[in-house]
Curated annotation (Swiss-Prot):
It comes from Geotalea uraniireducens (strain Rf4) (Geobacter uraniireducens). Pfam families: GidB. Its EC number is 2.1.1.170. It comes from the Bacteria. InterPro entries: rRNA_ssu_MeTfrase_G (IPR003682), SAM-dependent_MTases_sf (IPR029063). GO terms for cellular component: cytosol. One of its GO terms (molecular function) is rRNA (guanine-N7-)-methyltransferase activity. This is Ribosomal RNA small subunit methyltransferase G. It is found in: Cytoplasm.
Length: 219
């Protein structure tokens, strides 16, 4: 990562209330380097520059620290190159993370990065999200997705995997508020509701971001 990208990462994390240690920064630099290297061979991300990686992958992923705590079990559905799972795991080291993607090459990359960074309690799994219900019903405190699907589809797939007091978090960009509003009827039919809608902007770029936080409705 170049110096500009490093400063963007530090600034963005600080604005989120995260003060990255030198070890954590080193992990992010290694991750960025491997992402750039592997992306020349396989389709991990359309984002190529160090600055965009710092903001649109790393800082964007870290916005989840507004909701996710440093304990419990988190599932990331459709994680691609490891976002938001790996950035979150770097800063929330006590969190147990399962990162799932249907593309095997992307999962292999995530496992490679996890080994390099010595990430404990991190599991990258090659499986479709629909196939998890039988083996992982009711096991997760948080289930997250970033640009994986629309909100009702995400909720329908993942609610069976959520603990009774757990949270689903859909990461959305511009238009997230309208999408959340439009999903309320479908969520009600599924036995879920929006517990919180967090709105903020990424540093420097000012791009809009929303965290749509959902919960099960008590029987």
């Amino acid at each position: 990562m170049n110096e500009t990208a490093k400063k963007l990462l530090v600034t963005g994390a600080t604005e989120l209330g995260l003060h990255l240690t030198s070890a954590q920064l080193g992990n992010f630099y290694t991750y960025a380097s491997e992402l750039t290297k592997w992306s020349k061979k396989i389709n991990l991300t359309a984002i190529k520059t160090d600055e965009e990686i710092a903001l649109k992958h790393f800082v964007d992923s870290l916005t989840l620290a507004k909701v996710v705590k440093n304990k419990g079990r988190l599932l990331d559905i459709g994680s691609g190159g490891g976002f938001p799972a790996i950035p979150l795991k770097i800063v929330l080291h006590d969190l147990h993370v399962m990162s799932v993607d249907a593309v095997e090459k992307k999962v292999i990359f995530q496992r490679h990065v996890a080994r390099l960074l010595h990430l404990h309690d991190f599991e990258a799994v090659h499986v479709r999200g629909e196939e998890l219900a039988k083996s992982h019903a009711g096991q997760f405190d948080w289930i997250v997705s970033r640009a994986f699907s629309d909100i009702p589809t995400f909720a329908a797939m993942t609610l069976p995997l959520l603990k009774s007091d757990g949270r689903l978090i859909a990461m959305k960009g511009r238009g997230g508020r309208d999408e959340a509003e439009a999903a309320k009827g479908a969520l009600d039919d599924l036995g879920a509701r929006i517990a919180e809608l967090l709105e903020f902007r990424l540093p420097v770029s000012g791009d809009s971001r929303y965290l749509v936080v959902m919960e099960k409705v008590a029987d």
